[in-house]
From Swiss-Prot:
GO CC entries: plasma membrane
CDD domains, per the entry: ABC_NikE_OppD_transporters
Entry's family note: Belongs to the ABC transporter superfamily. Nickel importer (TC 3.A.1.5.3) family.
Record's catalysed reaction(s): Ni(2+)(out) + ATP + H2O = Ni(2+)(in) + ADP + phosphate + H(+)
Record's subcellular location: Cell inner membrane
Name listed for the protein in its UniProt record: Nickel import ATP-binding protein NikE
Membrane topology: Peripheral membrane protein
Annotated ABC transporter domain residues: 4-252
Signal peptide positions on this chain: none
Summary of subunit composition and partner proteins: The complex is composed of two ATP-binding proteins (NikD and NikE), two transmembrane proteins (NikB and NikC) and a solute-binding protein (NikA).
Biological source species: Shigella flexneri
Amino acid sequence: MTLLNVCGLSHHYAHGGFSGKHQHQAVLNNVSLTLKSGETVALLGRSGCGKSTLARLLVGLESPSQGNISWHGESLAKLNRAQRKAFRRDIQMVFQDSISAVNPRKTVREILREPMRHLLSLKKSEQLARASEMLKAVDLDDSVLDKRPPQLSGGQLQLVCLARALAVEPKLLILDEAVSNLDLVLQAGVIRLLKKLQQQFGTACLFITHDLRLVERFCQRVMVMDNGQIAETQAVGDKLTFSSDAGRVLQNAVLPAFPVRRRTSEKV
């Protein structure tokens, strides 16, 4: 079943010039894509190619200059109030900059409850129980509930943001470079966790990244973005080979391997 359909999406930003005339900077150009229920898709590209702008459009944080985004066959531009609330519940996003994504004055408990208060019909006791449950799902314990963001490590705060997104049981989770600031061990742990949660909840994932290692470990399909366009789409198999220049550049980048768990029988 198709969850999200994007057709002919273009976007630009207007900048004021010295002459007083607005200049338009094109960021996306005629982007089309589909995401199906339960699948994991990567949006791969270098920094500045338009990935994050596309993500903001997909979740409704901005409106496109041209084109259409449909959720379950309904255009986002035509959703009524009730449909828009359901859409905000069904599609959640985890940003790269977790510090800017939370209120530093709020406790973790309050941060986790926030989307549940606005998007779900749960009693306070049920919200608190789910907050604790989501923390355990991301390998954190209740000791962080009364802490505030400045008291957490970067890795812990990113996991809190992931738990917050999962608390409303979304149908689509968008991860915008969400593990890029984590060390390799934490990255590998998050990938294992996402696979487990995806199997448990059947959530579709759009994994926005410039890191091919994450694509090969986590995704079924990959789209390569370059200069605001989708350069190519490939299935992720044993030997992933790109035909576009942008894909080959990323494939040839030298990156360290993911850490692999030793078997208990192996000697150090």
